[in-house]
Amino acid sequence: MAGLSRREFLNTAGGATAALAFMAASGVRLSAAPLGLPIGSQMWPHRARIGTDGYAGLAAVLKDMKSIGIDSVEMISPSGEFKALTDGKQVRKVLDDHGIKSPSAHFRGVRTPGNLPTLIEWGNAIGMTHMNMASMGGQIVNGVTTLDMVKRTCDEYNKIGAITKKSGLQLMTHNEGFENSRLADGRLTYPVLLEYLDPDLVKMQFQMSSMRTIGDPVMYFTMYPGRFESAHLQGVDAAAGVNPPAAGQLTVKPSPEAQGGRGAGRAGGQGGGGGQALAVGEDSVDWVKVFQAAKTGGLKHYFVEQSWDVTVRSVAFLKTLNVT
């Protein structure tokens, strides 16, 4: 898929720089364990451990997560490997037993007629505040969609968001597939979605590994304040820029020479273009700058979404991250 064009990046990066300068001038200081928010984990990478074991499998995963400092998880609604977790009250009990909260889940079947009341009931029983979706699921062909499809999909989700909000759940969408596509005229779909989605009815969850496709998260967080209430964290080889490289530079931390230390460790990685998965903090992303901007973006929750061994390293880094 084509990346962010140079013109698109330059037209939007100025707003991000100005917003960050304003925050610095205002004396904003953020503490370690970024923004004072609990360190979270998405359950999807750990689904195989739950499987047919259901609540017992969930308990085993949560025990391990708590032991490394994870206090918040994002669940998956009952389906696939999570199909045994149909009783929201029982899920809540297992969570409470381990001192872990679940403010959101990725819900499947939100658009299916008749499904919404059951999904809302399940989320409410667990004590969730957000109903999330992996993708809005608009039609794309070879990575391309149409403006009409964007408008119709946004209209549908604005209506769903009004229903869920009345039931105590804020609708939110992650970005995969449809959200990471382009329009036939070459524009990125993501900013157009932000134009047509009601900012009060549908919030956003930014997938960090997508930054090389749809652009710098700092740019989005500062240009659309209050709209990004959640994020999935992965290590990203941001130093490679976007595709094509001429599109501009992403939020990259200073070079090893400027830091007076060693490099970030592994090359490539999850969301970074191949190789071993990169842990958060072992990559080239300037996470201090990302979390500074995320406060403007309205971040309430973030979840490491990586395999267990990489999650352990990412959590260790987040525990020490002092955002100032």
Residue ranges and their predicted role:
Residues L62, R92, I120, G161, ...:
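Short amphipathic alpha-helical segments and helix-helix/interface helices
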Residues D283-A294:
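A short, acidic, amphipathic alpha-helical segment used as a generic capping/interface helix at domain edges
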Residues G51, Y55-L58, G88, G143-V150, ...:
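Flexible, glycine- and charge-enriched loops at secondary-structure boundaries
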Residues R49, G80-A84, G109-T112, G138-I140, ...:
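Short, small-residue-enriched loops and turns at beta-alpha junctions
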Residues A2-H130, G226, L233, A238, ...:
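N-terminal pre-domain/capping segments
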Residues S72, T164-A279:
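Acidic/histidine-rich catalytic cores of soluble enzymes
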Residues A294-T311:
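Substrate-binding cleft of secreted/luminal carbohydrate-active enzymes
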Residues G14, A21-A25, K66, V94-K203:
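Active-site acidic/histidine proton-transfer and metal-coordination neighborhood
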